């Protein structure tokens, strides 16, 4: 799957949770404000844990950025954004289960294989696999993606959000199917190029 925000690749598997916040309006919310809202939401979700969550770039992680989230200097999440029709979408991937350092090693190997030692105009990160970890590792407890989804719901409720369980409309379903088909086609093209 190719995500539609951010600049570099991230690992998306069953142990990673993605959350998106959509801010309506072209100019009412700045990118930094939207990032800060996501950061504060994550802090709220984990307020019962005895940890400090920091936001600053972890340079030797994959997809480094100034809104990397870390505990004890190890990145477990990254926030990205993109402009969407009528607003801003802020997206976060949370490395919940498994090994964050193994995911980082996989991305390091991916870049090394893709670059084949060539110099490029764009600078790719020099990934240190030990710069990343999962929440499971950092919190030193068994935590699953589903647990974090419940933490998200509880945090939103505590913050006064109203959660609506509206069914998907026919128009939304058709758009989803169209986007899904485009993603399948795009991924097939990438696989074809990789098989050469």
Regions found by a protein language model. Give the residues of each.
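Contiguous, small/hydrophobic- and glycine-enriched helical/loop subdomains that border
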Residues: 16-59
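Aromatic/basic-lined ligand-recognition segments
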Residues: 73-81, 89-91
């Amino acid at each position: 799957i190719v995500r539609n925000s951010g600049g570099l690749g991230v690992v998306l598997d069953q142990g990673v949770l993605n959350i998106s916040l959509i801010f309506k309006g072209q100019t009412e919310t700045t990118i930094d404000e939207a990032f800060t809202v996501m950061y504060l939401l994550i802090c709220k979700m984990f307020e019962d844990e005895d940890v400090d969550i920091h936001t600053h770039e972890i340079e030797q992680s994959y997809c480094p950025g100034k809104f990397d989230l870390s505990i004890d200097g190890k990145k477990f999440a990254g926030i990205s954004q993109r402009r969407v029709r009528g607003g801003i979408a802020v997206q976060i991937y949370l490395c919940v289960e498994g090994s964050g350092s193994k995911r980082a090693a996989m991305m390091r190997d991916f870049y090394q294989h893709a670059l084949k030692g060539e110099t490029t105009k764009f600078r790719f990160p020099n990934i240190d696999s030990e710069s990343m970890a999962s929440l499971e590792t950092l919190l030193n407890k068994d935590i699953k993606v589903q647990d974090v989804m419940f933490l998200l719901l509880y945090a939103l409720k505590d913050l006064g959000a109203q959660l609506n369980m509206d069914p998907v409309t026919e128009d939304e379903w058709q758009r989803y199917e169209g986007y899904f088909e485009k993603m399948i086609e795009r991924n097939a093209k990438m696989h074809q190029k990789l098989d050469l």
